[in-house]
Amino acid sequence: MSRISICELAEWQAADRMFTLLDVRRTSVRLADATEIPGAHWRDPEEVFTWKDQVPRDRPVILYCAKGHEISQGIAATLEAMGLDARYLIDGFSGWHSAGQPTRSLSR
């Protein structure tokens, strides 16, 4: 299964590389954090089978959850099995935030 580091994702963002960034944190965790990685689109991890076919296939998709473990890795594996270039963010949102990378307030 493919993964991407915090530094690599920051480089991709700085280079304006084309990719889809999906926040797949559980609703309660996401709302408690009240922030997200800029450019991310939230998808409910509990509903993956209702939205998986809507993920663009023409570019890499990067997924992040709270810590970069079960949720993002499981969904990345599902998308990869469908033929998508799917990667999970190592250390997830907590690693991104701890590294001092930019975040934005959740859109209301």
Language-model features: locations:
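Rhodanese-like catalytic fold shared by cysteine-dependent sulfurtransferases
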Residues: 1-20, 24-62, 67-108
